[in-house]
C-alpha cells in the first residue's frame, strides 16, 4: 500500500497509516488518537459492564471482561464477585479513563492540526530526534528504547501494586499482598509449564524480571549505535513501514494466542470466582474453547469470551507477518 520514493502518491481516507508513514508528526497524531480510543473503550466498557452486572449471578458466569480484571486487582468486589459496599472505586477508574481519553484525543488533534506534520521540521531539537526513518536502525532502535522503558515502568507499577496493595489469591479466597520471587531458574522453567503455574509469587517474579529486561533493553537501545556499517547482511533494505507494522502485529498476535491458552486453563491468574470454570479445547476449522459448566442457551462464561476473542483476534494479527513484509522488500 505504501509507495516509497514517489512524491505524487496520494491516499484515500481508507488507507490508514499509509498516509502518515513518512510524516512522523502525523504518525504520532494517529497513534495518540488511537491510544485515546483504547482508553475510551476501557472507561466506557467498565460503565457498560457495571450497569449490566447482576450480583445474584456468579461473576464468572456473566459476559464480563473488564470487571473480573478489576476484581483480581482487589478493586470493588469480594471473593464471591459481589460488589463490596459500593462501586465508587470502579466508577472512579472508569471516569479517570474517560477523562484520560479526552486528554489523548486533544493530544492527537494538537499533533495533527497545530504541530509540524514531520518532526524533522520541528524547532525543538529533542523532537527532531524522534523523526522516523524506516531504513535507519539507529533511529528506530532509539524510538524502540523509549517504548521499552515505558513498558518496563508499567510492569513495575503492577508488581508494586501486588506488593503494597495486594491482589486476589484464589488459594485463600481473599486479597493479599504478594512479594515477588525472583528465582531465575523457576522463571526460565515456566516457559514450558506456565499454563499450570499456581504461585502468585512466581507470577510476580516473572513480571519483575520482565521489567528488568525491558528497562535494561530500553536503555541499551537508546544509548547504543550500530557497530560497523549497516550492511545488507545485517538487514539493510528489510526495514520499512510495512515490515515494522507486520512484525508488530505478529508480536501482538502471538501474545494474544498465548493469553488465550493461558486464560482458558489457568485458575490462579484467572480465578474461577471471577472468570468461570476452566474451558475444554475443541478443534474444527481452528481451535476453540467451550464451557465445562451448564449455562442457559446463548450465555457463556467470562473465560470463554476472553479465550476465544483473544485467540481469533490474535490469529488475524499474526497473519500480517508475511505478505506486508514480502511486498515491502
Model-derived segments and their meaning:
Residues 1-12:
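Extended, low-complexity, polar regulatory segments
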Residues 13-30, 64-96, 127-144, 175-208, ...:
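Juxtamembrane membrane-interface segments at transmembrane-helix boundaries in membrane proteins
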Residues 21, 27-29, 35-38, 43-47, ...:
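Soluble secreted/lumenal catalytic domains
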Residues 33-34, 38-39, 49-55, 84-101, ...:
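Hydrophobic alpha-helical transmembrane bundles of multi-pass membrane proteins
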Residues 50-70, 116-130, 162-183, 227-234, ...:
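Interhelical loop segments of eukaryotic multi-pass membrane proteins
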Residues 319-325:
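Conserved small/polar residues in nucleotide/adenosyl-binding loops
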